[in-house]
């Protein structure tokens, strides 16, 4: 994977833990990640907020303050001491938030001011639509967070552009109802995502940057009427920045909890993207191996299986029984 010498194709997928009290990662996190580290293995951190307005859930980690950077350092060092390659997932929740999680109790920001249609428990506060002149500030938050991640020792960053969070809220036409240069056409809807990629790549170098996308998913009421076109456009557009990898969620994962029968495939996106391609979404040992053997991906990310089996690469190697 360019400058990174991987010893296997199994990636630890990003998984939120919500144990970073005060948005500061705690010392015990080092054990959690080290248990899942192998020499030459790639791990992607839990979603990490790029700013105070990026937050959505209680006790999620951030990386916009000095004390957060300092708290991450021994955790990253511990992973490196076990030979792991560690990327920080940079995240902004957008409208998937409540005012209690926002500074001064303000409304969360988004590409839109549309509230969730299905929110019977009022879990989410109706969002405030970002003004066009505010968007560069959010882009800069991602840039600074990437700089902070490298200061903390991370090998690189993954931009969270999936699962209905802010970047996805701009890309998906079921959410984005803007009439400015960030809404309407596919090119306009993807503009924000690509500007974030450009800013982060210029800050830390494209060889240290990846992005996670879920064009086919309809999570957090963020679906698209033409997900294949969206995925292909993004895969092709990323090439001009020469970033390290593109991490895509399988079409069968319309939500984060169910696997659906699906005829769609990520193969067109895999063929369109020039860098390392990572797939995720309901993979087993067998179909992960098959996907690699058939050239449909370079790497396979596992979430739940890695959570239940910290030694997942060894179990896969031995074809040993797995905890569920």
UniProtKB/Swiss-Prot annotation:
Q: Does the keyword Acetylation apply?
A: yes
Signal peptide interval: none
Composition-biased stretches, type Polar residues, lie in 99-113
- Kindly list the positions annotated as binding substrate: 160-163, 252
Identify the stretch(es) annotated as Disordered.
Answer: 99-128
- Family label: Belongs to the NADH:flavin oxidoreductase/NADH oxidase family.
Entry protein name: Putative 12-oxophytodienoate reductase-like protein 1
Origin species: Arabidopsis thaliana
* Lineage, highest ranks first: Eukaryota, Viridiplantae, Streptophyta, Embryophyta, Tracheophyta
